[in-house]
């Protein structure tokens, strides 16, 4: 009998651990000693010592990582050996799948997906493109059909058909012809056939692209029409039929199921990054970069420019109301006009009369209304406009309404126009459009009112007869009242008999007074025209005295 021990089986778990450790130890390269000569400069020597310390620290870190990796491999090999030695087939299969998934996730390269953000951005860009084109088509056909942009126009009645046509055209020009949508092309992505796992990307087949277009274009159209039909069958106040209720319930369940499946697929997409949507997963179509030569660089130049301009515009909107841009604008405009006038005039022309921009306009035309409604700025252009019958000089639109005149030049404008211009200048004055004077105030126009000139008392004294007539009338009335009272006291029995005679006498007296007043008024007017007011007033007083004497005798 020999003392030799039987050879150990290499497939046993106990033999796997030292083999893995030996392999890891043998695969780890041993760094060769490097002869380094220290420099003679003290500063260089100090930096050289620091570099050596950093190099030693890196080697120690690398050795620690290698030891940790070897220990992890040993523990993993032991776990795999235990799972393989398990008696349950289900446990062995489940453990192997779990370990395979863990290896895929924890490996350095992972699942090697294309950029998830790029794929999601591509989908968002495609949807925004469709919505943008729908908006443009809606604006184009806005006033057809119902008219006025209401709810009965073509955009709302044929919304599903418009979406179908747009999606079909976009699908033909993008995926069917170039294997990529516009959003995917902007992200440097293309659809590939995920059934092929080679290093060369294979474009999807025609049946894959055809099914993709049928589901994304035709499927969405049919689903929207189906939902619209169910909504119409609802009937509002009437209860729908049992068939419609069952169909609505089935539709809701399908929608819920599709939403749940899409959510689960999206979670898997976030983990693996292969299939963006549920349809891509079913058809085995994935987005991948067609070439790896294009580097992904993020530039913030556009974003920085937008932020700067946004901040600058907000600053201007905050500062301009405080600065008073209107006042500065008026000041600059006034300064520019004065400068032009000084440059255009010479020294001998300074004594000429000031003339405004619209001095050629007739008096009945408001220069401000004309400036707002007409482009003619000189007399030649005005005559041309009048000849072609296109001017507005003599129209009711430019005639002066509620005339007001400026102070001190006295030019006439509309009240609203003139007050608006003066108020707009905020007390700094407004240049008259007719004469060029600086206007700060205005007043009602007095052109239709004729003011009487008062004569000097040194030349002639005018006595008004109205005061004299009023005084004489009061005296006559008082005398008549006294006479009547005396007659009543002396002859109380004859009051009834003489009442009628007295009334007749009073009527005759009043008539004579009225005749005298009219005669005196006519005589007064004629006397004023002949400049003989003094003599006529004396005659009038004499007549009044005679009339009073006659009344006393009566």
From Swiss-Prot:
Biased composition (Acidic residues): 485-508, 521-554
Protein purpose: E3 ubiquitin-protein ligase component of a retrotranslocation channel required for peroxisome organization by mediating export of the PEX5 receptor from peroxisomes to the cytosol, thereby promoting PEX5 recycling. The retrotranslocation channel is composed of PEX2, PEX10 and PEX12; each subunit contributing transmembrane segments that coassemble into an open channel that specifically allows the passage of PEX5 through the peroxisomal membrane. PEX2 also regulates peroxisome organization by acting as a E3 ubiquitin-protein ligase.
Zinc finger (RING-type): 366-435
GO molecular function, one term: zinc ion binding
Catalytic activity: [E2 ubiquitin-conjugating enzyme]-S-ubiquitinyl-L-cysteine + [acceptor protein]-L-cysteine = [E2 ubiquitin-conjugating enzyme]-L-cysteine + [acceptor protein]-S-ubiquitinyl-L-cysteine
Domain of life of the source: Eukaryota
Known pathway: Protein modification; protein ubiquitination
Residue stretches spanning the membrane: 116-142, 155-180, 205-231, 242-272, 300-323
The encoding gene: PEX2
Free-text note regarding domains: The three subunits of the retrotranslocation channel (PEX2, PEX10 and PEX12) coassemble in the membrane into a channel with an open 10 Angstrom pore. The RING-type zinc-fingers that catalyze PEX5 receptor ubiquitination are positioned above the pore on the cytosolic side of the complex.
BP terms from Gene Ontology: protein import into peroxisome matrix, receptor recycling; protein ubiquitination
Positions with biased composition (Basic and acidic residues): 509-520
Oligomer status and interactors: Component of the PEX2-PEX10-PEX12 retrotranslocation channel, composed of PEX2, PEX10 and PEX12.
Entry EC number(s): 2.3.2.36
Membrane topology per record: Multi-pass membrane protein
Binding-site residues, Zn(2+) 2: 409, 411, 432, 435
Regions of this protein lying in the Cytoplasmic compartment: 143-154, 232-241, 324-554
InterPro entries: PEX2/10 (IPR025654), Pex_N (IPR006845)
Region (Disordered), start-end ranges: 1-63, 470-554
Name of the protein in its database record: Peroxisomal biogenesis factor 2
Cited Pfam families: Pex2_Pex12
Cellular component terms per the entry's GO annotation: peroxisomal membrane
Family according to the record: Belongs to the pex2/pex10/pex12 family.
């Amino acid at each position: 009998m020999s003392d030799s021990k039987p050879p150990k089986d290499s497939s046993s778990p106990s033999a796997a651990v030292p083999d893995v450790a030996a392999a890891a130890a043998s695969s780890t390269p041993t760094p060769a000693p490097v002869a380094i000569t220290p420099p003679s400069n003290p500063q260089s020597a100090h930096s050289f010592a620091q570099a050596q310390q950093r190099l030693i620290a890196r080697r120690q870190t690398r050795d620690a990582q290698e030891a940790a990796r070897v220990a992890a491999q040993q523990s993993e090999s032991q776990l795999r050996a235990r799972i393989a030695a398990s008696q349950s087939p289900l446990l062995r299969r489940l453990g192997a799948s779990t370990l395979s998934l863990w290896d895929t996730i924890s490996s350095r390269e992972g699942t090697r997906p294309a950029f998830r953000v790029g794929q999601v951005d591509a989908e968002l860009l495609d949807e925004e493109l469709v919505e943008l084109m729908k908006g443009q088509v809606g604006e184009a056909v806005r006033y057809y059909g119902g008219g006025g942009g209401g709810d009965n126009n073509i955009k709302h009645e044929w919304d599903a058909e418009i979406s179908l046509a747009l999606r079909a055209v976009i699908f033909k020009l993008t995926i069917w012809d170039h294997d990529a949508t516009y959003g995917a092309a902007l992200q440097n992505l293309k659809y590939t056939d995920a059934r092929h796992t080679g290093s060369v990307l294979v474009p999807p087949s025609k049946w894959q692209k055809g099914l993709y277009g049928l589901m994304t274009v035709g499927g969405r159209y049919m689903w929207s029409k189906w939902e619209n039909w169910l909504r119409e069958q609802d009937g509002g106040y009437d209860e729908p039929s049992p068939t419609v209720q069952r169909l609505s319930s089935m539709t809701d369940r399908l929608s819920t199921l599709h939403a749940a499946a899409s959510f689960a697929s999206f979670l898997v997409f976030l983990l693996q990054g292969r299939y963006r949507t549920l349809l891509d997963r079913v058809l085995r179509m994935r987005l991948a970069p067609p070439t790896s030569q294009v580097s992904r660089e993020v530039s913030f130049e556009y974003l920085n420019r937008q932020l700067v301009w946004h901040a600058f515009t907000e600053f201007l909107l905050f500062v301009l109301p405080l600065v008073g841009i209107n006042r500065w604008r008026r000041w600059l405009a006034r300064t520019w006009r004065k400068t032009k006038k000084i440059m255009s005039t010479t020294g001998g022309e300074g004594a000429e009369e000031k003339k405004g921009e619209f001095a050629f306009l007739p008096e009945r035309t408001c220069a401000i209304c004309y400036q707002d409604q007409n482009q003619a700025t000189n007399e030649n252009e005005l005559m041309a406009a009048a000849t072609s019958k296109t001017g507005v000089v003599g129209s009711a639109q430019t005639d002066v309404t509620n005339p007001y005149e400026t102070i001190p030049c006295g030019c006439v404008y509309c009240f609203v126009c003139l007050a608006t211009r003066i108020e707009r200048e905020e007390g700094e004055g407004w240049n008259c459009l007719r004469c060029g004077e600086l206007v700060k105030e205005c007043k009602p126009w007095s052109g239709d009112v004729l003011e009487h000139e008062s004569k000097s008392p040194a030349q002639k004294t005018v006595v008004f007869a109205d005061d004299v007539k009023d005084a004489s009338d009061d005296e006559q009335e008082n005398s008549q009242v006294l006479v009547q009272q005396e007659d009543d006291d002396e002859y109380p029995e004859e009051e009834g008999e003489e009442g009628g005679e007295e009334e007749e006498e009073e009527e005759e007296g009043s008539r004579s007074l009225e005749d005298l007043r009219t005669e005196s008024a006519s005589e007064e007017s004629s006397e004023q025209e002949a400049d003989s007011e003094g003599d006529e007033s004396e005659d009038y007083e004499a007549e009044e005295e005679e009339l009073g004497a006659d009344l006393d005798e009566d």
